[in-house]
């Protein structure tokens, strides 16, 4: 049985950029519902006892998702999203991460521009990701609709932003580009992204 994990900081820790009210609904209602519904769906099935990652890969079913896929992927995506942020985040990455960004996108500024564009142009609900492609040993930007994530493509997720309306509507209403800019400038945890890259390239 999966349990709803709290974000790695207090609910008001990302104020004023992400309000505790947003967390109350986004984590306390939406994320909780994905976990609760997943537990109901897998109870007593062959999926019971598998890791979240395994459930995602099995239920993706090569692009013809089985019923548990959406809740499993959304439970995973949200935990990953909370851990992609930190209080007093933003700034620029350093070390190997910055080297790969410069190599694969031309510059950090070019990467930010592309990431923001990917997040802003994801039509409807979904996610934008920085991912590592292990076969090519390269970074890539990925947009995914609804619950999908780069795991189903065989990529390693490094960073994500949630662009479902419930992620930003209480704080930014329909101003998705403003939310994306604040995420990159004030919230992103480059330490988390760097440690994920280190694990992916180990």
UniProtKB/Swiss-Prot annotation:
Keywords: Chloroplast, Iron, Metal-binding, Oxidoreductase, Plastid. One of its GO terms (molecular function) is superoxide dismutase activity. Gene3D superfamilies: Fe,Mn superoxide dismutase (SOD) domain (1.10.287.990), Iron/manganese superoxide dismutase, C-terminal domain (3.55.40.20). Its EC number is 1.15.1.1. Its main location: plastid. Induction: By environmental conditions. Pfam families: Sod_Fe_C, Sod_Fe_N. Binds 1 Fe cation per subunit. It catalyses: 2 superoxide + 2 H(+) = H2O2 + O2. It is found in: Plastid, Chloroplast. It comes from the Eukaryota. GO terms for cellular component: chloroplast nucleoid. Fe cation binds at residues 26, 78, 162, 166. Its cofactor is Fe cation. Belongs to the iron/manganese superoxide dismutase family. Destroys superoxide anion radicals which are normally produced within the cells and which are toxic to biological systems. PANTHER family: SUPEROXIDE DISMUTASE, SUPEROXIDE DISMUTASE [FE] 1, CHLOROPLASTIC. Homodimer. This is Superoxide dismutase [Fe], chloroplastic. The gene is SODB.
